């Protein structure tokens, strides 16, 4: 159902922090024209913690209407409140999204049983397709494979975004009826070659067409070509993470003329000492800026 290059889309903002809805429309069109396989909106890269309820509604509605079922739209709906997560997941479904991406609760530090009950409760409350999201580096909470297997018994839990970079987890879970998606660009090739279906990618923001081709190659199991394409993209794997995501990728896109320069506090624009490194990596992958 969900596979290939699924871009973790940035939310374009003006320098005063206001969302640029006109530019968002242009950005979505750019991805449609450049073979992106799906859009993941209002996730980590989309600065979801700083987006208001009114803005969420407007963003989801605009993107759903524009895409018009050409490619899947996945909306980040996770929070550390079960009730709030259910509300946002319900909203995504009502506005026409294809799936919800639900991160493990952050700050609360639930047990594995707590995680099971949390995801089971949401799955039973809202019938939209749901993708679990495990990113312990941000949440201080690790969704273990044995817990994923329990949650996967819910019929509308259809996938897992695994951002630990642990390839063994793919091998443990590939027998399950789940779309396994990497959430870590640096290890995405090995993830897909081990049985993953695709990537929810930060890097795909700046190189959508090459990243789509790379995902097709890796998912098909063409090891030699996948390594070649991965090497071509590799300058971005470090440079786009020199500071907290999405700081570097938004700066890169602004340098490319794709989006304005805005980002919301507590995130700040890319530190000047990293400008040359990010610019050089863009040039290494053939982007003029």
Swiss-Prot record:
Q: What GO CC annotations are associated with the protein? A: cytosol
The cross-references to Pfam families, in alphabetical order and at most eight, read:
DHDPS
From the UniProt record, list the reaction(s) this protein catalyses.
L-aspartate 4-semialdehyde + pyruvate = (2S,4S)-4-hydroxy-2,3,4,5-tetrahydrodipicolinate + H2O + H(+)
Site note Part of a proton relay during catalysis applies to 44, 107
Record's subcellular location: Cytoplasm
Its pathway, per UniProt, is: Amino-acid biosynthesis; L-lysine biosynthesis via DAP pathway; (S)-tetrahydrodipicolinate from L-aspartate: step 3/4
- This chain belongs to the protein called 4-hydroxy-tetrahydrodipicolinate synthase
């Amino acid at each position: 159902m969900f596979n290939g290059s699924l871009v973790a889309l940035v939310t374009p903002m003006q320098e005063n922090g206001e969302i640029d809805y006109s530019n968002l429309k242009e950005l979505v069109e750019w991805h449609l024209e450049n073979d992106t396989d799906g859009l993941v909106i209002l996730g980590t890269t989309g600065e979801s913690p700083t987006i208001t309820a009114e803005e969420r509604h407007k963003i989801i509605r605009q993107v759903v209407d524009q895409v018009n079922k050409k490619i899947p739209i996945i909306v980040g709906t996770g929070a550390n409140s079960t009730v709030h997560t259910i509300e946002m997941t319900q909203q995504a479904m009502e506005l026409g999204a294809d799936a919800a991406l639900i991160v493990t609760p952050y700050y609360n530090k639930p047990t594995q049983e707590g995680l099971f009950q949390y995801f089971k409760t949401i799955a039973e409350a809202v019938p939209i397709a749901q993708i679990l999201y495990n990113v312990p580096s941000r949440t201080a909470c690790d969704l273990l494979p044995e817990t994923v297997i329990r949650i996967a018994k819910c019929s509308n839990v259809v996938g897992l975004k695994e951002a630990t970079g642990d390839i063994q987890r793919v091998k443990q879970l590939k027998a399950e009826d789940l779309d396994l998606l990497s959430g870590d660009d640096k290890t995405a090739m090995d993830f897909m070659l081990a049985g993953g279906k695709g990537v929810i990618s930060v890097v795909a923001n700046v190189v959508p067409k090459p990243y789509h081709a790379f995902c097709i190659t890796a998912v098909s199991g063409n090891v030699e070509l996948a390594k070649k394409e991965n090497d071509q993209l590799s300058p971005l794997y470090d440079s786009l993470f020199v500071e907290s995501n999405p700081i570097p990728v938004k700066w890169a896109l602004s340098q490319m003329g794709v989006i304005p320069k805005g980002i919301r506090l507590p995130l700040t624009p890319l530190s000047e000492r990293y400008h040359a490194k990010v610019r050089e990596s863009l040039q290494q992958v053939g982007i003029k800026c």
